[in-house]
Amino acid sequence: MEAKPVAIWLFLCSLMVICMVGIGGFTRLSKAGLSITEWKPITGTLPPLSEQDWLKEKSKYEATPEYKAFNYGMSMEEFRTIYLIEYVHRLIARLTGLVFILPFIYFTLKKRIPKNAVIRLSTALLFGILQAFAGWYMVKSGLVSNPHVSHYKLALHLLLALVIFALLSYQFFDYQIKPKQIIKINSNITCYIWIILILVTVQIIFGAFVAGLNAGLIYNTFPLMDGQIVPEDLFYLQPAWLNIFENRVTVQFIHRALALLILVLTAILTIKNASIKPLYVMLFSVIIQVILGIVTLLLHIPMAIAIAHQMFSFILFGSGLYCLRYLRNQI
């Protein structure tokens, strides 16, 4: 079957994007993201190969505010560890790009991809290029006087990854779902799924805010926030709207509230349309994601569960896209 290699390639690319999200989370939680102070897309492919190279890289890091504030006196062995974590992060990002670009060129030249898919995948390529620049833009924000990556730029980096994943996975579903699997449905269902996907996107952005502001380190109780449904200090910043984006308490409160809203809406949609089996996959994904979020909070952000929570948000989004593709043009 001619479409099968293309479908396998799209699945692999989608999977690699999810893996990159996990690696990015591991890099952030390991506090290794600022260890490489330069961005060299081509020459940066190789790590330091000699002791002199390592000393040179360490001296560059020692000039950064992060080193002076948090890692002063760090040994060479400790530096190698965080450097290699960030190096692997960047290397796999390059590898992901190659795994996408080379087969894309081949399949396009061989006319194995329909024209509408070429446009969609070219858009994914464009966003991939933007993602590379956004990654460096994010790192650069932490190399200034305040050694802390901007949570806005962290959210942008994650959002671009989500767009790339959405384009790739939706195209993959195009190859996987056959007409015989599709049923007649009410037009309102797709509208409801779109609403849920928009809420999931906003939730992922607020997840990035929670991570960037270390908001997961406060109010480590559930369902109440230290005994309160609505915690104090929700609006202590002025102007009031700033709390939505920069107040750790408000950001965590919104993240919790959105999770419950998405769960309730997905449950209602599934119950009302019990004959549509893909909705159960989306509901199950929401339940797993909520559980991962609660456990991450209660256990004070254990690395493995926190990374799983971040990665699974993309799987949840993908389950919603699958539902959309399953129901498309069946009105």
From Swiss-Prot:
A GO CC term attached to the entry: plasma membrane
Any GO MF annotation of the entry: oxidoreductase activity, acting on NAD(P)H, heme protein as acceptor
GO biological process assignments: heme A biosynthetic process
EC numbers on record: 1.17.99.9
Cofactor: heme b
Topology versus the membrane: Multi-pass membrane protein
Binding annotation for heme: H255, H309
Pfam families (UniProt xref): COX15-CtaA
Catalytic activity line of the entry: Fe(II)-heme o + 2 A + H2O = Fe(II)-heme a + 2 AH2
Class in the EC hierarchy, top level: oxidoreductase
Origin: domain of life: Bacteria
Role, per record: Catalyzes the conversion of heme O to heme A by two successive hydroxylations of the methyl group at C8. The first hydroxylation forms heme I, the second hydroxylation results in an unstable dihydroxymethyl group, which spontaneously dehydrates, resulting in the formyl group of heme A.
Family: Belongs to the COX15/CtaA family. Type 2 subfamily.
Subunit organization: Interacts with CtaB.
Protein name: Heme A synthase
